[in-house]
């Protein structure tokens, strides 16, 4: 697994989170990297947030796992901002697509978080599923369940090493 770079935002999060779910999102902006997104959310009140941003070559953490990010809302379903971890995949492929490498890095991060928090595979969901089908996120989730099912099948078989650690910059 890639090292997790940290740029923890002082904005847009709750002081409490009890991770029982993982919500998969996509950034929705073409060619925006994980580092760009972490910097953007670090820079001010954006009225949204996510725990992690993932691209082809890096993973950036923007909100502590123990804090609730503003990524799925609080009242619509059993999954909410205070019991889930939000992961945003960056869109580096054409037409707001997610590359295979970004998807693989996301799989490894999700597997690591599942192991760390005891989250079952059934509790890994897309934002689309959580929102009651009102938010097409990731962009392939509304009309390509085969891709998400394949993502979850891969997830069931991914072996992941723990991320490296060093002087506060990497988890």
Model-derived features with residue positions:
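N-terminal catalytic cores of peptidoglycan-degrading enzymes
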Residues: 1-80
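Basic/polar, cationic surfaces and motifs that engage anionic cell-wall
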Residues: 3-6, 12-18, 90-171
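Hydrophobic faces of well-ordered beta-strands that scaffold small-molecule active sites
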Residues: 24, 85, 124-126
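Residues within well-ordered beta-strands of beta-sheet-rich folds
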Residues: 25, 53, 86-88, 107
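Cell-envelope and extracellular/periplasmic
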Residues: 28, 80, 85-94, 115
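Short, surface-exposed linear patches
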Residues: 44-48, 74-77, 83-85, 107-111, ...
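Short C-terminal domain-edge/linker segments immediately following a structured domain
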Residues: 53-58, 81-85, 116-120, 154-157
């Amino acid at each position: 697994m890639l090292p997790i770079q940290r740029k923890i935002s002082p904005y847009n999060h709750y002081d409490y989170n009890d991770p029982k779910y993982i919500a998969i999102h996509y950034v929705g902006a073409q060619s925006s990297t994980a580092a760009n997104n972490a910097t953007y959310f670090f820079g001010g009140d954006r009225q949204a947030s996510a725990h992690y941003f993932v691209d082809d070559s890096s993973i950036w953490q923007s909100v502590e796992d123990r804090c609730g990010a503003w990524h799925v809302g609080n009242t619509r379903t059993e999954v909410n901002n205070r019991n889930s971890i939000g992961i945003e995949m960056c869109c580096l492929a054409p037409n707001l697509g997610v590359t295979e490498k970004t998807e693989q890095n996301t799989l490894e991060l999700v597997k690591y978080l599942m192991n760390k928090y005891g989250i079952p595979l059934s509790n890994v969901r897309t934002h689309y599923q959580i929102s009651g089908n009102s938010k097409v996120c990731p962009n392939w989730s509304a009309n390509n369940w085969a891709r998400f099912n394949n993502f979850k099948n891969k997830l069931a078989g991914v072996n992941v090493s723990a991320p490296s650690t060093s002087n506060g910059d990497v988890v």
